[in-house]
Amino acid sequence: GKSGSWEATDYSENMIIEAEKRNQGEHKCEQLRFCVQDATNLTYEDEKFDVVVIANALHIMPQPEKALKEIHRVLKKDGILFAPTFVYKKGYSKFLIWLMEKAGFKTYHKWQSEELKEYVGSEGFQVVGAALIKGKPLSEYVLVGKKE
């Protein structure tokens, strides 16, 4: 098959350092590069990537539309977005959310699955696949979008 390269990014320099430590030894991936990036202001040129994964991040961003705009910019024509994101059930426990935020898990967006699907669809992506992975306390909605 065709081999390519991978770019792993995070907003936190400490997370990048930890990821680099884990990419060592006999299972080291030579095609993997690590870089600190702000998803709302990426330093990559336009239409650089075939695929972008933004995992468990959209709901913790004050302005996720900025990240989606940047992802749209750096994706090639017909590029694919994978966006696994924590979602909430209708009537979720306000107490549970309060408790999670006190523990440091701050969320700005408490989307339900269909709300997230509509949101991403309104930001320049055609939703071509989605799956709900049930979990406790939160479920995860794995959304696949194609750049329009």
Listing of model-derived features with the role each one plays in the protein:
Residues 82-141:
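C-terminal alpha-helical "lid/dimerization" subdomain adjacent to the S-adenosyl-L-methionine
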